[in-house]
Amino acid sequence: MYIYDEFDRTLVEERVREFRDQVARRLSGELTEEEFKPLRLMNGVYLQLHAYMLRIAIPYGTLSSDQMRMLAHVARRYDRGYGHFTTRQNIQFNWIKLEELPDAMADLARAGLHGMQTSGN
């Protein structure tokens, strides 16, 4: 199992900080949805018909017990109590509110999970 080192943690934490700012700019109207789209896709965030969806990578298809607990926490706290495992070894949360996405991503980052490189677009 791949274990994150300090470089990985710093990279993911910085991405979360950047995305938090980008979400604030989107919510304030400073960014249009078209301008926001490539920024959210870089972080595994898709706009569905009724809500945003967050796709999280499962590193090498393996989860630690701490990571599984964090996924459960995110499902309970930010979604509707469940997630969807994909055929590409990712998990999707389909009902996270845009304003809560940065907090969910920060929680996931503490467990070494993120949505980078999960966008097929």
Spans of model-derived segments:
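Feature of Fe-S/electron-transfer and energy-metabolism proteins
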Residues: 1-121
